[in-house]
């Protein structure tokens, strides 16, 4: 990337903004080296790092990288056997401490299943060096102070120094607090030449024995070391020398122990600097509300609602800028001060940011290209500092640009062809654009020459554009209008500002009809565009409301489905419960019938059997009769009369009404029996449904004639077979069989196993066994009842 365009587009100002978010000198050095890249993989990896940093900033508030200085020069000294001072060792200690903290931080991210694209791999390269790290951190504090724990000898020497200093202070306090204090300029103990002294007034020098070490600038105060503490000061000096010697020994020892790890320490410092740099990119992106760009290898640029990164997002006008897909050249026409130059700079600088791995100031889903180089000729005539730009300097720059461009270049021309005769300037501008197009480069050019308005219509892969101007307020809106060439507003502005109408009309007549027609066409296009934009806003609103309604309906539908499933589950549970209760009662009744059968030898009295059968039927009727309001109401509304044929629901038997037996009861003839039945248990039968009654019919227990002593299930599906077994066992018990045979076949054994499990749970079954070999063996089971 050519260096000139970085200066022209103020790339360094973006880097200056990044500096504010760094905490290490290594991170600042990476910003110094930051430049746009044209390598897809390099840009992609850099953006992935920025994304990881942005995710960490959002979730955890950033990567914990503290203030660190570069240790590169310190490590070089260690490589040649040098000894570092305590502050230099402290700087290395801070790097090791930061390394440990960063390792813990990323381990916590991993434990919490936080997903990152690249940083886990980068951080895995950090070397903790636990042993030397622990020793260094114990021996040297952050500010470079060597701690008492650095060695036993150092701790002992410092204890001796403390005792000696305390003794000296006690001796001197006798002077500062007693009657001798009047001889002192100040009643304080001070130090001169590393020895404790007293500030004695000049005239009382003879009152004190000892050594004079210094005097005040006025000569009125002498700093005297009293004779009584000379020996103590000498002892203190010896102890301080011993302390320095021990500290130097400790520093030398630590330096030697660190020397083998200079490569690891240098690598750690680089990674911490990189993390600081990533932190800065993420924080800068957050500060300007930037988003992650999509990389387009085809250089299909689409910046959605982009704004200049050096402008306040809240105040800057946002524009959609597109180039590369449908066209490779944009010609922005129209008068000055409309925002053409800032639009050019925005496109160029945002493209540089994206190719540097930075987030861009645009809405999400914006795309940037990957250009090998970006060229710009922007004189910025609106800037006072650049007001000396001339046609010659512009043309010199353009000549250099044309030499360096190819199909992977983006070229930005501001006021192309300006600074010379308008007719010649327009012709030059057209020729230059043709030359750029011939090399396949992407180009955006601004101009105020009306001749270039037709260029976008005549040239392939080229489109016109303009900066919107509000005719009502006579102010530019700074909005980019792709597809609409700029129009002159001079006549309208002049008339609004008070220029005589006749003068304006005369001026219009002096312009060509084609020019007037073009301006009217442009005005019509602008009006239609405004109408389309308003409709788009309205349709987007309708779409958003429809999407919200769809979401609500979908949510309610899913909620309804969940409620339905819950109700079905509850109903199934209740049904299963009822079935279990019913089966239990049925088993009890069947057992009772067997006892009755056994006690009666062969026949069961009709009344007992009917009563038992009625109780079985009642099990099936109970729930329905209680819950079915329609059936209850129908029963209440039916009119019963003597001699009516009725169904006794609880017994499942037909009968004939004889007479009323109370408010809600009837005497009913059931076979040879007469029974009193509650009216709610009776259901009137229509005459056509009845059959001729046989008088004196006797109900016998010999129902065994209708039940076979053998049940053959061969060829049946498992589910159907188990249902038949259940029904068959009940029927066999009611029929009074002592034993029956169930033929299930051998097959896979699944049906046999299911039948055996069923028989084990059936209370009416006494025991069971496989049939004899000549009667089917384990392909048939003989069941014995209680």
Swiss-Prot record:
Keyword ATP-binding listed: yes
Enzyme class name: hydrolase
InterPro entries, per the entry: DNA_mismatch_repair_MutS_C, DNA_mismatch_repair_MutS_core, DNA_mismatch_repair_MutS_sf, MSSS, MutS, MutS2, P-loop_NTPase, Smr_dom
Sites where the protein binds ATP: 334-341
EC number(s) on file: 3.1.-.-, 3.6.4.-
Residues making up the signal peptide according to the UniProt record: none
Recorded superkingdom: Bacteria
One example of a Gene Ontology biological process annotation: rescue of stalled ribosome
Pfam family, one: Smr
GO molecular function, one term: rRNA binding
This protein's UniProt keywords: ATP-binding, DNA-binding, Endonuclease, Hydrolase, Nuclease, Nucleotide-binding, RNA-binding, rRNA-binding
Smr domain location: 711-786
Complex and partners: Homodimer. Binds to stalled ribosomes, contacting rRNA.
Family: Belongs to the DNA mismatch repair MutS family. MutS2 subfamily.
Function: Endonuclease that is involved in the suppression of homologous recombination and thus may have a key role in the control of bacterial genetic diversity. Acts as a ribosome collision sensor, splitting the ribosome into its 2 subunits. Detects stalled/collided 70S ribosomes which it binds and splits by an ATP-hydrolysis driven conformational change. Acts upstream of the ribosome quality control system (RQC), a ribosome-associated complex that mediates the extraction of incompletely synthesized nascent chains from stalled ribosomes and their subsequent degradation. Probably generates substrates for RQC.
Name of the protein in question: Endonuclease MutS2
Naturally occurring in which organism (per UniProt): Ligilactobacillus salivarius (strain UCC118)
Name of the coding gene: mutS2
